[in-house]
From Swiss-Prot:
One of its GO terms (biological process) is D-glucuronate catabolic process. Its EC number is 5.3.1.12. It catalyses: D-glucuronate = D-fructuronate; aldehydo-D-galacturonate = keto-D-tagaturonate. It holds the Pfam family UxaC. The gene is uxaC. Belongs to the metallo-dependent hydrolases superfamily. Uronate isomerase family. InterPro entries: Metal_Hydrolase (IPR032466), Uronate_isomerase (IPR003766). Pathway: Carbohydrate metabolism; pentose and glucuronate interconversion. Keywords: Isomerase. This is Uronate isomerase.
Length: 472
């Protein structure tokens, strides 16, 4: 098969039919990404391919480092063309890596350039693409609109004033840009900045934070504020997690000691995190939001690189906490007793957790359709094999037709072809089930499932259009 042909990843006739007739043209809701609200609002043109393609993309940075490229041409102040040339040389060696496929797919879909990126073609592609980047069709909002994206959910700190979201809500009519709340600094209470962060949260919420109860009250005010601007999700990174009973625990003392930068015991930290997550579950339930939990990841494990370059620069790895599903089971058992389990999507960076998590969510579904979901293959699992394995586990342990599907988790405006990539994997997976006689060769039945996973489920699950739908 030709590289990136119209049928790439589609290995049977049913897969081809399902993709081209039922998946390809469905709109996109990107419910978890790391685009900056300011960049969407300001809608500035990018000067060149390096700025739009390599800036902030730690997936690509990891490959560049593996190819011996100096940091000056990765995150440093090197010349933009030299950075792109270094990437082109690296991409030649990335055969078999999904970045090779994504990058060429993005080049083909956005720039209509059907050439292989290499050191020989770099200058030609650079010049041709940069000419297009100078046009209005390559401003951020046009890229979103022309990708048939209906909703973009950014990732925002509770203290964010969401000023650009407010402006976009008034001005942008072709798609929604909605905030998703991620209170990292309330979780990272041992990083030495907890006191300053509580001061900031107090100021923006208008609530004086003097103990755990008032801290949660301030957080609730931010849930209300985010809701007023269309917010429907929270997101939480738990690199590791150990459940701890919180009854009769002096949480106020733990907070005070963290503010004073005193050392907390592991038990105290686990008690605080458990209490915090339970309160966050309660708030998600109250506001009819969806809680996302990203677990089992080792972040910024290269200390010198962290100090020199900073966070989110490509020095993270898969976590190996073997009992994290067991600890989450204790958390959900406690939440069930309190009747505070919200809609939840669970992601783990370690595939060994997926089957355990899939069986866990089956124990706590509650009322409503697929209230708990096993999240799409995340980060290092964002590959054809990773996507297929997640689909297989979801289908075998729950109801695949209820799955809310793909997200980009990206910092790039050119990443939307990842939805196409996922849909191709989905259609091929389902096509194989038909070919092997495991599900009916019924286009109406199976085609609807493909359309639902591609768009309809995520539309209904999060309720981004609830007000508009109720008026129809």
């Amino acid at each position: 098969m030709k590289f990136l042909s119209e049928d790439f990843l589609l290995n049977n006739e049913n897969a081809k039919l399902l993709f081209h007739k039922h998946a390809e043209k469905m709109p996109i809701i990107d419910y978890h990404c790391h685009l900056e609200q300011e960049e969407i609002y300001e809608n500035k043109k990018y000067e060149n391919l390096t700025q739009i393609w390599l800036g902030g993309d730690h997936y690509k940075w990891r490959l560049l480092r593996a190819n011996g490229i100096p940091e000056k041409l990765i995150t440093g102040d090197g010349d933009d063309y030299e950075k792109f040339l270094a990437f082109a040389k690296t991409l030649e060696k990335s055969l078999g890596n999904p970045i090779y496929e994504w990058t060429h797919l993005e080049l083909k879909r956005f720039f209509h350039i059907d050439k292989l990126i290499s050191s020989e073609t770099a200058k030609e592609i650079w010049d041709e693409a940069n000419q297009m980047l100078a046009t209005d069709d390559f401003r951020p909002r046009a890229l979103i609109k022309n990708s048939n994206v209906k909703v973009v959910c950014t990732t925002d700190a509770p203290v964010s004033k969401l000023s650009y979201h407010k402006s976009l809500a008034k001005e942008e009519k072709d798609f929604k840009v909605l905030p998703a709340l991620r209170p990292d600094h309330l979780i990272s209470i041992t990083d030495g900045h907890f006191a300053e962060y509580l001061t900031e949260l107090s100021a923006v919420s208008g609530i004086k934070i003097k103990d755990f109860k008032t801290m949660i009250k301030a957080l609730e005010q931010r849930f209300e504020f985010f809701t007023s601007l269309g917010g429907r999700l929270s997101d939480h990174s738990l690199s590791t997690y150990t459940f701890a009973e919180t009854d009769d625990v002096d949480l106020d003392s733990i907070i005070q000691r963290a503010k004073e930068k005193q050392t907390l015991t592991d038990l105290e930290y686990n008690q605080y995190i458990t209490a915090l997550i339970l309160e966050i579950m309660k708030l998600n339930k109250k506001f009819d939001w969806t809680m996302q939990l990203h677990v089992n990841v080792n972040r910024s494990i290269n200390g010198p690189a962290l100090r020199k370059i900073g966070e989110n620069t490509g020095f993270d790895s898969m976590g190996t906490q073997a009992n994290i599903s067991e600890e989450l089971t204790k958390l959900f058992s406690k939440a069930a007793e309190l009747e505070i389990i919200p809609k939840t999507i669970l992601y783990s960076l370690n595939q060994n957790d997926w089957l355990e998590l899939a069986t866990l969510i089956g124990c706590f579904q509650g009322e409503g359709v697929q209230q708990l979901q096993l999240g799409a293959g995340w980060w290092f699992n964002d590959t054809a094999k990773g996507m297929e394995k997640q689909l297989e586990i979801f289908a075998s342990q729950s109801l695949l037709p209820n799955f809310v599907g793909m997200l980009t988790d990206s910092r790039s405006f050119l990443s939307y072809p990842r939805h196409e990539y996922f849909r191709r994997v989905l259609c091929n997976f389902v096509g194989q089930l038909i070919e092997s006689g495991r599900i009916p060769d019924d286009e109406a039945l199976v085609g609807k499932m493909i359309e639902d996973i591609s768009y309809n489920n995520v539309h209904d699950y999060f309720g981004f259009f609830k007000n508009e739908d109720s008026k129809q």
